A protein has these predicted regions:
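Short acidic, low-complexity intrinsically disordered linear motifs used
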Residues: 187-203
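Small-molecule kinase domains that catalyze NTP-dependent phosphoryl transfer to phosphate-bearing small molecules
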Residues: 110-113, 118-166, 177-179
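The conserved Walker
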Residues: 16
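ATP-dependent NMP and nucleoside kinases share a basic, alpha-helical "lid"
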Residues: 49-55, 72-129, 135
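Conserved lysine of the Walker
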Residues: 20
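Hydrophobic anchor at the beta1->P-loop junction of P-loop NTPases
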Residues: 12
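Extreme N-terminal, non-catalytic leader segments
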Residues: 1-9
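Conserved substrate/cofactor phosphate-moiety recognition/catalytic segment
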Residues: 25-70
């Protein structure tokens, strides 16, 4: 099977409020335009459905990432384009996910902490500052920036459309997507040309 017909995982990492979920949903729509089956594993949804027993400590965070990576691996093996949108603050856990999944594209959604705090749509930073959430990344726990991600998006400097287009371009460069101008295989092109020739449209 050619690489571009295989599944892959786009693994977003970054602080809460950096824009991971917002970009994920636009990316999903764009990937569908390429004819791909797409699934999103959003941090909030995963915590609600698979990780109700876990908090925000380093150990709990690692377990959350292990569970997400396992699901990503299964979906990727079955040809799905998977989008993981979780903070995943620790480098070692992300590297383990990369090794387990295989077709792995790490995207660092980079945004200054003060901008994330201003956005704070979920109110998590506010709760963290009040002490209602312990071990919260960026406040009481560290975030380890990726050393060699496939892509860095600076969401305080670019809009969602620009960020998403950068991801699509990278996926094409890596061979996971065809360009839209090249949607037919050589065999399919031959059949189309033969049919058009038989109908008298081309000589």
């Amino acid at each position: 099977m050619e690489k571009m017909n295989k599944g892959f995982t786009v693994w977003f990492t970054g602080l809460s409020g950096a824009g991971k979920s917002t970009i994920s949903h636009l990316l999903k729509e764009k990937l569908k335009e390429f004819g791909r089956d797409v699934e999103i594993l959003d941090d909030d949804v995963v915590r609600t459905n698979l990780c109700q027993d876990l908090g925000f400590s380093e150990q709990d965070s690692d377990i959350t990432i292990q569970r997400i990576a396992f699901i990503c691996k299964l979906l990727t093996r079955n040809g799905v384009a998977v989008i993981s949108a979780a903070i995943s603050p620790y480098r070692e856990a992300r590297d383990k996910a990369r090794n387990e999944i295989g077709n792995f594209v790490e995207v660092y959604v980079k945004c200054p902490l003060e901008v994330c705090v201003e956005r704070d749509a979920k109110g998590l930073y506010k709760k963290s500052f009040k002490g209602e959430i312990h071990s919260f990344t960026g406040v009481s726990h560290p975030y380890e920036e990726p050393q060699n991600p496939e892509l860095i998006l600076e969401t305080n400097k670019e809009n969602v459309e620009e960020s998403t287009n950068k991801i699509i371009k990278k996926l094409i460069e890596l061979g996971y997507l065809n360009t839209k101008e090249d949607v037919y295989s050589s065999e399919e092109e031959g059949m189309i040309i033969k049919r058009l020739s038989g109908l008298g449209y081309i000589n």
